């Protein structure tokens, strides 16, 4: 089956697409949130631009890897594992050859999203964000695609901030990222809010953790 890649500039977000993406991104980030028990708040609490800390939406992008339109029904409360099972059952194989910048209708887009990956503009280039995958062996393809987008928009480096306790460092090293620094993140014992980290405001955690800054040269 042939899927397609939708590349959206974040300044072009429409309300219906943002609503779908909030559900999808939270579902994707809930998987490590529940598995490792470090972060206690959803990834998106208010809006995409605010919670992803997007300062320059004109130069920030998100790619959606879409399955073909079908009768799959994705419920708001479905877990990442449940969504993956639904997609594999319907589409044992999916390839991607078509790129688009918009859809005519976003009303059912959530039931097609196999994965998402974005880059946001920062002073040093771009930073990886909104990385979710609900289909086997898709992560590498999404990485390759978004690195290509980074090159096209003139970035020389892509930064990734990852939580060490989520066991992500080796995954990024496999994709030619190198570790730059580690930052201990403490929580306020009373409020459970994370103190003085690179994360957006309002993040609560169940325990102290470590952020790892990683970099890939394009």
Q: Residues of each region from the PLM?
A:
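Conserved acetyl-CoA binding element of GNAT-fold acetyltransferases
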Residues: 97, 106-110, 115-136, 161-162
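Short hydrophobic/aromatic beta-strand or adjacent loop that forms the aromatic wall/cage
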Residues: 59-60, 206-215
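A short beta-loop-alpha structural element at the N-terminal edge
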Residues: 2-23
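Conserved GNAT-fold acetyl-CoA-binding loop/helix
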Residues: 26-63, 67-90
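Conserved GNAT acetyl-CoA-binding A-motif
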Residues: 125, 150-167
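Glycine-rich phosphate-binding loop
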Residues: 136-142
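Conserved beta-strand-loop-alpha-helix junction that forms the acyl-donor binding cleft
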Residues: 133-135, 159-173, 178, 182-194
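A conserved short alpha-helix in the GNAT/GCN5 acetyltransferase fold that borders
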Residues: 142-152
């Amino acid at each position: 089956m042939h899927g397609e890649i939708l590349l959206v500039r974040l300044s072009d977000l429409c309300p219906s697409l943002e609503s779908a993406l909030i559900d999808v991104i939270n579902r994707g980030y809930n998987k490590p949130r529940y598995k490792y028990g470090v972060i206690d708040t959803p990834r998106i609490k208010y809006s995409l631009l605010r919670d992803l800390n997007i300062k320059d939406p004109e130069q920030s992008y998100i790619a959606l890897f879409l399955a073909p339109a079908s009768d799959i029904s994705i419920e708001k409360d479905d877990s990442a594992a449940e969504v993956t099972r639904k997609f594999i059952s319907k589409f044992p194989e999916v390839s991607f050859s078509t790129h688009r910048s918009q859809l005519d209708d976003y009303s059912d887009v959530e039931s097609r999203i196999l994965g998402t990956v974005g880059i946001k503009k920062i002073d040093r280039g771009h930073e990886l964000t909104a990385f979710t995958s609900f289909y086997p062996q898709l992560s590498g393809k999404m990485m390759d695609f978004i690195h290509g987008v980074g090159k096209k928009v003139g970035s020389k480096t892509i930064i990734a901030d990852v939580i060490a306790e989520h066991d992500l460092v080796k995954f990024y090293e496999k994709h030619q990222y190198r570790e730059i620094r580690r930052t201990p993140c403490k929580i306020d014992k009373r409020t459970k809010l994370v103190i003085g980290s690179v994360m957006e405001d309002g993040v609560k955690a169940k325990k102290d953790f470590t952020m790892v800054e990683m970099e890939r040269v394009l």
